[in-house]
Regions:
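Periplasmic c-type cytochrome electron-transfer domains
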Residues: 1-209
Length: 209
C-alpha cells in the first residue's frame, strides 16, 4: 500500500543485490539505479510526492543536515546528493551469505531433504532462476491469468513489441521466504501457491516461457 492506502498495479520488488542489475522495475523501464528512486517518489499511488518536496523536508531537519555534512563535508542537500545517498544504501544490501553460499564455499553441507530440493530446483527452476543470483534478469511470461482490473501488459508497455506482452523481469529467489507476497502483482501469499501455479502451467490458455 502507498500513500493513503492506495493500491498500485505491482508488487514492490526486493532491493537486495541491485548491484548486479542493469535494468530496474518489473518491466525494465529504468536503466540507472539513481533514477529508480524517483519512480516511487513520483507515483501518485506510492509516495505521491516530488524530489523538491523531499529535499525541502530534509533541509528542515537538523539531523539530516548533520548526516550530509558527515558524508559530503558540508550540509548542502540537493537532488544529486539525495539520489546518490539512496542508491549507495540500496547497493549495500547484498545477499551472498545464505546456507547455499556456505555450501558452495565448502563450509556446510545440505541435509538429505535439501539435496533433493536442490536437485528439483536444478531440473525445473534453474533455467530462469539461474545461480548464483537466482535470476537470469530476462523478461518472461510467467503464465498467470491476466487480472481484468489491472490489465498489466508488462514489458510491452516499454517496448511496444507484441511479443513482450505479459512479460516481467525474473525475480531473484534469494530470501524468498521473506519477500512475500509473490509474483509481479502480489497475488500469491504462500510459496506453495507459486509452486502449484508452475506445476499446473500447461492449463493456462496463454503460452508461458
Amino acid at each position: 500500500h502507498g500513500i493513503q492506502d492506495s493500491i498500485g498495479n505491482r508488487n514492490a520488488p526486493a532491493l537486495f543485490n541491485l548491484a548486479w542489475h542493469k535494468e530496474f522495475m518489473w518491466d525494465g523501464a529504468i536503466h540507472h539505479i539513481e533514477a529508480q528512486a524517483l519512480a516511487p517518489l513520483h507515483d501518485s499511488r506510492e509516495l505521491g510526492s516530488s524530489i523538491e518536496a523531499l529535499i525541502s523536508k530534509l533541509q528542515s531537519s537538523g539531523f539530516y543536515q548533520t548526516e550530509f555534512f558527515k558524508v559530503y563535508g558540508d550540509s548542502l542537500i540537493n537532488s544529486k546528493r539525495v539520489l546518490q545517498s539512496l542508491s549507495a544504501f540500496e547497493l549495500s544490501l547484498v545477499s551472498l551469505q545464505s546456507k547455499y553460499d556456505r555450501v558452495n564455499q565448502g563450509k556446510e553441507v545440505f541435509t538429505e531433504q535439501e539435496k533433493q530440493g536442490y536437485l528439483l530446483f536444478q531440473n525445473h527452476c534453474n533455467r530462469c532462476h539461474r545461480e548464483p543470483l537466482f535470476s537470469n534478469f530476462e523478461y518472461l511470461d510467467n503464465g498467470l491469468t491476466v487480472d481484468p482490473f489491472l490489465q498489466d501488459f508488462g514489458r510491452f508497455l516499454i517496448t511496444n513489441v507484441e511479443k513482450d506482452k505479459y512479460k516481467f523481469k525474473v525475480p531473484s529467489l534469494r530470501n524468498i521466504s521473506y519477500t512475500y507476497p509473490y509474483m509481479h502483482d502480489g497475488r500469491f501469499d504462500k510459496l506453495r501457491q507459486v509452486l502449484v501455479h508452475y506445476g499446473n502451467i500447461t492449463v493456462h490458455s496463454r503460452g508461458s516461457d
